[in-house]
Amino acid sequence: MSSTEEMSSVKNTTQVIGVDPSSTVRVTIVQSSTVYNDTPATLDKAEKFIVEAASKGAKLVLFPEAFIGGYPRGFRFGLAVGVHNEEGRDEFRNYHASAIKVPGPEVERLAELAGKNNVHLVMGAIEKDGYTLYCTALFFSPQGQFLGKHRKVMPTSLERCIWGQGDGSTIPVYDTPIGKIGAAICWENRMPLYRTALYAKGIEIYCAPTADYSLEWQASMIHIAVEGGCFVLSAHQFCKRREFPEHPDYLFNDIVDTKEHDPTVSGGGSVIISPLGKVLAGPNYESEGLVTADLDLGDIARAKLYFDVVGHYSKPDIFNLTVNEHPKKPVTFMTKVEKAEDESNK
């Protein structure tokens, strides 16, 4: 229907719940824009779309990258090599204010929305941990539980100046009654080893919130669906110039930057693809709205008859991936008891 200090080998450690391969699951992508500099209003907007998707039978709802907090396309933050300025500092202060703490009140509200509407929810958000920001995907269950998060491990280009880098401790794949759900954010999808880690954890519904609406992106999504033998859901914002806050110093490529002209700044392209490489819904480049498809879960087994990238088509005697899932912290504090135990073990 249209409209992931100790090193460990990659393995699927999720609890097996089991999915009926004969079942069909309806999933929905929300293609819409952030309300910039207004996180409460963005949450209100998200609620509207979640309610609408659930009313149409969706069991999983996916939002775009950085939907809460906003994807700062064209923002400069006063950045230039060897240059620092007050305007950039103020711009970052405002952006930081729009980000959310995880856990926090906004996360609680999202969990409540997922539970009230009986949906699995995957939400793109800008997370603040102290004064470092992360581009994060948040996962919620239909029982109203916050399951956990994935922090983008490698921001792209100038994103690295405003977002921190996630570590291997937040690369989850959740085993749910509708399938194993995980996420790769934007150009993480171009990292073969990251994708392989998700495949090894058994991902079946591969969520790809993104800020890339190029034609090449569509080709990547089809490739990943076929490579991983999984359903791929790619969510992108659709945003017009008028929806950005007033600012004299945005840099938008190939468009006339005036609110009167009101060009499209983020061009959509949300799409749903089957494990066999078939486009089930989208891409939508025209407007905000819902992109919905019914997933035949039996297609996963059908696809893996001939190609299982971490199973019968792998070659572990030659190629092997190791993933460090230990949290990386800049400072570790040891109590006197821990120090004594450490000394006694030497």
UniProtKB/Swiss-Prot annotation:
Keywords, in A-Z order: Acetylation, Cell membrane, Hydrolase, Membrane
Topology within the bilayer: Peripheral membrane protein
GO MF annotation terms: indole-3-acetonitrile nitrilase activity; indole-3-acetonitrile nitrile hydratase activity; mRNA binding; nitrilase activity
Gene Ontology CC: cytosol; plasma membrane
Modified residues (N-acetylserine): S2
EC code(s) of this entry: 3.5.5.1
Stored InterPro entries: C-N_Hydrolase (IPR003010), C-N_Hydrolase_sf (IPR036526), Nitrilase/CN_hydratase_CS (IPR000132), Nitrilases_CHs (IPR044149)
Domain of life where this protein originates: Eukaryota
Enzyme class: hydrolase
Pfam family, one: CN_hydrolase
PROSITE patterns: CN_HYDROLASE (PS50263), NITRIL_CHT_1 (PS00920), NITRIL_CHT_2 (PS00921)
Coiled coil feature spans: none
GO biological-process terms attached to the record: cellular response to sulfate starvation; glucosinolate catabolic process
Residue intervals of the CN hydrolase domain: 25-297
Catalysed reactions, semicolon-separated: a nitrile + 2 H2O = a carboxylate + NH4(+)
Cellular compartment(s): Cell membrane
Active site: E65, K152, C186
Biological role stated in the UniProt entry: Can convert indole-3-acetonitrile to the plant hormone indole-3-acetic acid.
Family indicated by similarity: Belongs to the carbon-nitrogen hydrolase superfamily. Nitrilase family.
The name this protein goes by in its record: Nitrilase 3
Gene that this polypeptide is encoded by: NIT3
